[in-house]
């Protein structure tokens, strides 16, 4: 891809900004907090933040911009939310109208950006502990699934949780649980382990987003809350305009993955 996965966050963002890199960000910038993204009109921002507060597992807020300001200085010195995400999704009245790599022509002075922690953040800790992460090994995006788990509504925002799935060796499930629990700003501990049917998932080979990965003998499917959840909720709210990241294509911040608070300090 022309950009090494261990490059620092600023170098990766610069490559994204220039158009040189536009792929998924799983496994990139080890040690840094990766973020899901929601951009919406200020008139709906408070209701959306209420929704996130009521559903912290799938929606851990780590950054909020000033109204109309595309910069996110609390997450990094040079982050421009209009250019620094590899791929964006554009929704108008609840309809996905396209995916783009730059939203400067869509930016207006009434938009608010909300960054939410991503489970890609704790994957580096799993790998360091010797726990295999299949989609990183395979070089693909993490599989994501819609579930039957209801969310707590706020204003026009409501829906069901989306989860990521990682096959974990059965003997390592407790270890993976304990490690990810140390990252509440990145969805924290798993929400379920084992039978996907209990979550309303019919077939692990057919993810709703991302790429399918094999669950090998001796492995157990483990499910974490996922930041595509608020993306679906925003779509279903049918706002005149909202912008999100494309699944798997995250904002990479300068905040340490294990920071007690998601505030960048130079």
Swiss-Prot record:
It comes from the Bacteria. Belongs to the D-glutamate cyclase family. SUPFAM superfamilies: PSTPO5379-like (SSF160920). PANTHER family: D-GLUTAMATE CYCLASE, MITOCHONDRIAL. Pfam families: D-Glu_cyclase. Gene3D superfamilies: PSTPO5379-like (3.40.1640.10), PSTPO5379-like domain (3.30.2040.10). Its EC number is 4.2.1.-. GO terms for molecular function: lyase activity. This is Putative hydro-lyase Jann_2570. Keywords: Lyase.
